[in-house]
């Protein structure tokens, strides 16, 4: 992947980690496991056209990387940020496959997004972009197939906009997006969950050294 430095780095790090295990099992080589893991199942790349509040038409690139669904439907967030490109999303989808497998839940790995930068955009502009993004993608996601969520630049508001557009187009709404707002059926305290998880993890690590969290600062 010479033109995809982020993806190349992610793949190299994982392969270095599993090299000894891989070399000890001839079945991995016979099944061409490495190449199958490194090449995503599907890559969707598309133009997203949207209109700003002044009536000017803009074009951004949209993507969805369906990396691997060996153990379940594709699952991974959607990122809106000016730095988004194919290499970054392939890297994120690749790692998402492994992260999801560690949960022991039947979920594959995916990632999507656009180089659209929501910073400085009005609520109406963000809504129109979210709707335009899903207009191009909706046929390739859905329950049992690919369940997106939020990521950088995509919170509950943006997920709600995309979820609403998907419902309108697909006329179906079960199990399509996670990370929705409570008013759209989202999970309670989901925004806090990652932060709480970090604290619980830190507490367990401190216990191994008989250290208390109280009074500690960074």
Predicted regions and their residues:
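N-terminal ligand-binding/catalytic initiation module
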Residues: 1-193, 199-201, 205-208
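Short helix-loop-beta connector
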Residues: 211-216
């Amino acid at each position: 992947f010479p033109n995809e430095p982020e993806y190349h780095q992610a793949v190299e790090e994982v392969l270095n980690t599993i090299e000894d295990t891989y070399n000890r099992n001839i079945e991995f080589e016979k099944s061409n496991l490495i190449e199958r893991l490194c090449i995503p199942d599907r890559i969707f790349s598309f133009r997203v056209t949207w209109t700003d509040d002044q009536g000017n038409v803009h074009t951004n690139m949209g993507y969805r990387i369906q990396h691997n669904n060996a153990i379940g439907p594709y699952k991974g967030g959607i990122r809106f940020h000016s730095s988004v490109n194919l290499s970054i999303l392939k890297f994120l989808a690749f790692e998402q496959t492994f992260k999801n497998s560690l949960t022991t839940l039947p979920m594959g790995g995916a990632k999507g997004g656009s180089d659209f930068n929501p910073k400085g955009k009005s609520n109406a502009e963000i809504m129109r972009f979210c709707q335009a993004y899903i207009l191009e993608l909706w046929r390739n996601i859905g329950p049992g197939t690919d369940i997106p969520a939020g990521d950088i630049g995509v919170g509950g508001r943006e997920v709600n906009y995309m979820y609403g557009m998907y419902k309108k187009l697909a006329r179906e709404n079960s199990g399509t997006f996670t990370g929705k707002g409570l008013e759209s059926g989202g999970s309670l305290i989901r925004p806090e969950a990652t932060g709480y998880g970090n604290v619980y993890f830190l507490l367990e690590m401190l216990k191994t050294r008989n250290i208390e969290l109280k009074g500690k600062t960074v």
